[in-house]
Amino acid sequence: MKKKALAFAAAACAFGMLLSGCGSSNGSDTAAEGANIITAYNSEPQHPLIPGNTNETGGGKPVDLLFSRLISFDAKGNASNEVAESITANDDATQYDIKLKDGWKFTDGTDVTAESFTKAWSYVANAKNGMVGSSFFSTIKGYDALQDTDNLKGDEQLEGLKIVDDHEFTVDLNKSDSVFAIKVGYSAFAPLPESFYDDTDAFGEAPVGNGPYKFQSWDHDNEIVLVKNPDYKGNRTPKNDGVTFKVYTKDDAAYADIQSGALDVMESVPASATKTFETDETVQAYNKAGSVIQQFTIPSSLKHFEAGTEEGTLRRQAISMAINRENICDKVLNGTGTPAVDFTSPLTPGYSDSLKGVGNLKYNEKKAKELWEKANAISPWTSDDKLTFAYNADGGHETTYTAVVNSINNTLGSEVAATNPYPTFNDYRTAVSDRKVQGAFRSGWQPDYPSAENYLVANYASAAADGNGSNDGDYKNSEFDDLCSKAAAAQTTDEANKLYQQAQEVLLNDLPAVPLYYANAYGVAATGVSGFEMNWQNLPVYENMTKSGK
């Protein structure tokens, strides 16, 4: 997300909604009342619906259904070829030959060709175009040449992409990347039709894709309507006639709509219902281990917390040790989250709960005070200093971050921390993206593809800093980058995972972000819905859902 930057807390009130169920958009003959249309809750997307410029769930959910990539994932995260006929790597994973299946079309009737991919990838990679997914293409040869915005027009192409014919192209990488064949399942790697380049702004408001659904309408701050794509020929054929994403800013209202049948599915529950939703007979409940991690990021340049300095490291570790994660998971999240011990998730290949430095994620009042005082000896923390925690108030995060702040202040014995809520997810994400947040800020990660690489490189690699990806804290550490590069070049999965674990140990010392908890995959559906399950991204499998009697 998607995705990535999560619009809502994936555990104690994962997604925010409006006080009352949002109104539906103007209907049409295609998505008419009485059709087998699934209504799903959502936030207003931060950006227009362009795959390469979407890295949060409000936009990520509709984008995923609108655009098919080279491969797709089933509910458990297993990959299968989708648009690709084959993806073949050379011996050291520095070159890939990609062949496409014949007959794929966009919903405007134009063909999906090799150029549909190479041109789209180059556009997203090109820094002149300001796409948030740019860093995902950093291993492709020629990426660095597309980062000098002063000397670019925006239409320059990645040197490493070569078209063989309409159904085949090759990818030359600047270093080994054994994860590349899985990475291309992420939405940033979606193909784009020629109409995109004619008017990118208009396209983002009414996208043309090649996925299981096609776009019908977008009533901003209200709903996004998708209908079944009758020409889709991939692995995710819808069992329903469409999905309407309804925008909420209060999760209690969304839950009430699930109970009444006015809304079909939501991938969370409000804090007020975390103790009772599994026994609530007016809903279908789902609650299993999930892949989402919730954390907060401390900007690398923040006063007293500067990355790479002795004071900054001491204070980051002290803050982390001052947080009682067990208490938050038990008392605030009511068992819908598990204290984090790394930067991935228990469902991620290579997960370990015994990494060097894991003690920095454990509650330790004595050590937290000791480290804080050592930092004070370097540069005193004064009454004018305050570590604020920004979050979106429409996402149900207040109870979690109130608990975080209280734990820090109770542990360190002073008013060190305070909450800093933003009214909406859009307000909050804009402030984060524009580097306007003068303090820590809520962050979370929903995997784009099932690999430790996705959690680590997307969020902490130097190439993903400075607005080129999801490294919103602008953390840069060459040792971490080198370990991730070695992992990508590893010949076996076990070797790669060991290197990713070493990279995590660098993060556990530096704490560019502070992991809080792993969110369960949990949510509710209306009682009249069939086929309700959550996938490896902690999201409903929308295409499998139907309504009784429809």
Describe each region flagged by the PLM.
Residues 41-91, 208:
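N-terminal lobe/hinge region of extracytoplasmic solute-binding protein
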Residues 113-120, 166-172, 211-212, 240-242, ...:
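Alpha-helical secondary-structure segments
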Residues 167, 172-238, 242:
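Gly/Pro-rich hinge or "lid" segments in bacterial periplasmic/extracellular proteins
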Residues 196-204, 231-276:
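Ligand-site clamp/hinge motif
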Residues 317, 329, 414-428, 455-526, ...:
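Extracytoplasmic/peripheral linker and loop segments enriched in polar/acidic and small residues
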Residues 338-375, 394-399:
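Structural transition elements
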Residues 523-550:
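Long beta-strand-rich cores associated with HINT superfamily self-processing modules
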